[in-house]
């Protein structure tokens, strides 16, 4: 099993490029199921989850290939007849596999999809997906770990539906389903993340009638059919945010290229609050970590609030602050599993339910640590960069689900980091 080995305490200087957003690429690729023909999705990161979705679509009868000259381009050929099944063997490691449910129901009128896997960071049920699809006219049964769904009459019907809680994949799944439904659909209390807007833009490019994607209310007028997709996904705001935090670590100076400043407002506000210098530059943001960070209080929230996917990374910065910070996690339970590993590096963190009190220490010291989920693994890499001595990050398969060869991106900045194949 691979591990990442870091010799920490070395200042980072230079520029780093942001890959395409995994959480935008996955729903856009799933949307290809809505239309027969040849599709092209650009700026796609080469990540485990993306490869898994490609295997899943291949199982369904689609042809999925990476561009020979441009590995960031994925081309898909979707046949008229698609096998509407997502077996457990292919989706057990990837929560986003549920995104095929809406397109399959909309185009084929039936689907059998295994309940999803992914990071073990608390209960992330798909009940909102199923309630909304039922409101669109689907009949759904949960049997033997699978969602068995069908559409009496063959075509979903438009509806008005309010999500009980904001859900990104739920909003995306229902948007895709409603794109081919008969009549008008109005979705309320929708997730407002940039990835939702990106999917809306992709659907519009396919000929869908969608308005309001990226706001809390989305209007969709169903059409009989859609044309093949051609779309470039947005940059990954969480990868960009991870590099921004790296730049804010004491003594560092990092420019993050391809970073969309509008997607980083909540994080930038906190970075400036801790004392980092953040400036807009051509094509991105520059961050300078000037001295020891100041403590701040952080509360995660759905977009446009502070992203839960950046909570662990920011905690690393606050572990070095001159004072005590408070982090409140409101989105997911069990999202402090990285804390025990940070403590191994010398951090002083106490957790009580959804609140973590972070008492800053002058320095961290390297040690072997074990990743528990995707964003925790990124936090441990950041901690290893800041720590003195050697840090080994184990279970980096979590890291590879969301970061495209992170060691190759950090090394040109001066980081002493390498992957050891296991």
From Swiss-Prot:
Q: Which residues bind phosphoenolpyruvate?
A: 22-23
EC identifiers of the protein: 2.5.1.7
Please name the source species: Anaeromyxobacter dehalogenans (strain 2CP-C)
Quickly give the catalysed reaction: phosphoenolpyruvate + UDP-N-acetyl-alpha-D-glucosamine = UDP-N-acetyl-3-O-(1-carboxyvinyl)-alpha-D-glucosamine + phosphate
Check the record and name the PANTHER family matching this protein.
UDP-N-ACETYLGLUCOSAMINE 1-CARBOXYVINYLTRANSFERASE
**Which pathway is it part of?**
Cell wall biogenesis; peptidoglycan biosynthesis
Q: Which UniProt keywords apply?
A: Cell cycle, Cell division, Cell shape, Cell wall biogenesis/degradation, Cytoplasm, Peptidoglycan synthesis, Pyruvate, Transferase
Cell compartments where the protein resides: Cytoplasm
The record's principal subcellular location, in a coarse class, is: cytoplasm
In the record, 2-(S-cysteinyl)pyruvic acid O-phosphothioketal modifications are located at 119
Q: What is this protein called?
A: UDP-N-acetylglucosamine 1-carboxyvinyltransferase
Q: Which domain of life is it from?
A: Bacteria
Which gene is annotated as encoding this protein in its UniProt record? Answer: murA
Which positions make up the signal peptide?
none
Q: Name one GO molecular function term.
A: UDP-N-acetylglucosamine 1-carboxyvinyltransferase activity
- Quick one: a GO biological-process term for this protein? regulation of cell shape
User: Which SUPFAM superfamilies does the record cross-reference, listed alphabetically?
Assistant: EPT/RTPC-like
CDD domains tied to this protein:
UdpNAET
Listed InterPro entries: Enolpyruvate_Tfrase_dom, Enolpyruvate_Tfrase_sf, MurA_subfamily, RNA3'P_cycl/enolpyr_Trfase_a/b, UDP_GlcNAc_COvinyl_MurA
Give me the Gene Ontology terms describing cellular component: cytoplasm
NCBIfam families from the entry? murA, PRK09369.1
Which parts of the sequence bind UDP-N-acetyl-alpha-D-glucosamine?
95, 124-128, 309, 331
